[in-house]
Amino acid sequence: MKRIHIVAAIIFNQDKSQIFITKRPDDKHKGGFWEFPGGKVEPEESVEQAMIRELEEEVGIKVTEQSLFEHLEYDYPDKSLKFDFISVTAFEHKPYGKEGQEGRWVDIKCLPEYAFPEANVPILERVVQEFSS
């Protein structure tokens, strides 16, 4: 099974106390779960370019500062994914669910209260451990 390359953004607010998350549409894979916004890396596209494009499309922000937070591969029964989780610490505009999906700022310490897909859980735990005060 071919691995699908995905970029996902950990979008921090200015003082790194909150992260912007979005809810997956009910009709999509892992529908109804919360997630770090992002999407597929297109052929001939760098991870950085994909992150900029996906966040403009999904949450309406222009990324100005990003760095790799974690690389992870995960196999679901029906698909294999290769993730690059990107820390986004500077951007222009206010994020919102541009494609009609629900989006919100969440205190980092409250992230475990939200249901995320299994592949996101190790990243979620690391974010909470490193950034909750």
Locations of regions flagged by a protein language model:
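Active-site-adjacent beta-strand/loop module that shapes the phosphate/pyrophosphate-binding cleft
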Residues: 62, 72-94, 104
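Conserved hydrophobic "DFG−1" position in protein kinase catalytic cores
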Residues: 11-12, 21, 90, 105
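Conserved Nudix-box catalytic region and its N-terminal flanking loop in Nudix hydrolases
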Residues: 18-57
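Short secondary-structure junctions
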Residues: 58-65
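Conserved S-adenosyl-L-methionine
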Residues: 67-71
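Conserved N-terminal beta-strand and adjoining loop/helix that marks the start
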Residues: 1-19, 40
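NUDIX/MutT-family hydrolases
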Residues: 87, 96-127
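Generic C-terminal helix-cap and adjacent flexible tail
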Residues: 128-133
